């Protein structure tokens, strides 16, 4: 028996009822973009991340060099730096991940979709989008769905990870967000931006895995700063880690406090 389903069956039932009431029955044949799960190694599950406003070209190039050296799954950078990362990583096997509607999720639906379209055209292999947090907290589930769907469509064929910003949500809202994301064809659900006052924890990862099953990937991000943190997230059900402390994680060193 799937213990996640057994542990979270009541929550899943409530979330299904809420989403069905707002959006209707789950449509048949939802095309889910393939979640680009990489190697079984720890490094191969990490998105090496630099999303700070003061990131420079030199810092992005260093990030890319570290990703190549350690064989991380991707680098995750703001859309401003996608062309730089794509050029630096060409032929390396390391993907370019970028963020859309980041970090607030409060852009218009059309603006998010256009940002995603441009990012993919400029070389992004994956897109991590922040969902409409205010819409979710307002119980406007149709707006949340349309927001994600627009980015998923604009980003194709690149897979989309939907950032929930779990520190701002209760468990029912987290569950509802996961089920909505699954309806759109998104490839992953993701915990956090790292800028919203909280980060990943094992409880949220297990909850998210229970809601999406094996159909979608689950990404833990924010406050993952050590090898022990990363392993705890993987054990709870994550299959991708977002971290700025990636080198420390794979080397077993202590990371500086305050990293993504």
Whereabouts are the PLM-identified features?
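Alpha/beta enzyme core
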Residues: 32-70, 80-102, 108-218, 226-249, ...
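Short, hydrophobic beta-strand segments that form beta-sheet elements in well-ordered domains
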Residues: 75-77
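Short hydrophobic "strand-cap" motifs at the C-terminus of beta-strands
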Residues: 221
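Compositionally biased, intrinsically disordered low-complexity segments
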Residues: 22, 250-253
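Charged, compositionally biased N-terminal leader segments and the immediate start
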Residues: 1-46
């Amino acid at each position: 028996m799937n213990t996640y389903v057994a542990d979270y069956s009541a929550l899943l039932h409530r979330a299904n009822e809420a989403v069905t009431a707002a959006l209707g029955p789950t449509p048949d044949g939802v095309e889910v973009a393939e979640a680009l799960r990489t190697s079984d190694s720890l490094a191969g599950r990490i998105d090496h991340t630099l999303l700070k406003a003061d990131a420079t070209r030199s810092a992005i190039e260093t990030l890319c060099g570290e990703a190549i050296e350690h064989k991380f799954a991707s680098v995750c950078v703001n859309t401003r730096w996608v062309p730089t990362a794509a050029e630096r990583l060409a032929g390396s096997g390391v993907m370019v991940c970028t963020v859309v509607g980041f970090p607030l999720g409060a852009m218009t639906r059309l603006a998010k979709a256009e940002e995603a379209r441009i990012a993919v055209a400029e070389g992004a292999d994956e897109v991590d989008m922040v969902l409409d947090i205010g819409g979710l907290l307002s119980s406007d589930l149709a707006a949340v769905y349309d927001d994600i769907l627009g980015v998923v469509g604009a980003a194709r064929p690149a897979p989309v990870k939907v950032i929930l910003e779990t520190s701002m949500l209760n468990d029912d809202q987290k569950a509802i967000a996961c089920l909505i994301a699954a309806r759109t064809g998104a490839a992953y659900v993701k915990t956090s931006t790292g800028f919203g006052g909280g980060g990943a924890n094992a409880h949220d990862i297990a909850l998210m895995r229970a809601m999406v099953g094996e159909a979608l990937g689950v990404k833990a991000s924010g406050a993952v700063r050590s090898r022990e943190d990363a392993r705890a997230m993987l054990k709870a059900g994550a299959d991708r880690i977002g971290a700025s402390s990636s080198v420390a994680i794979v080397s077993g060193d202590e990371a500086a406090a305050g990293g993504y």
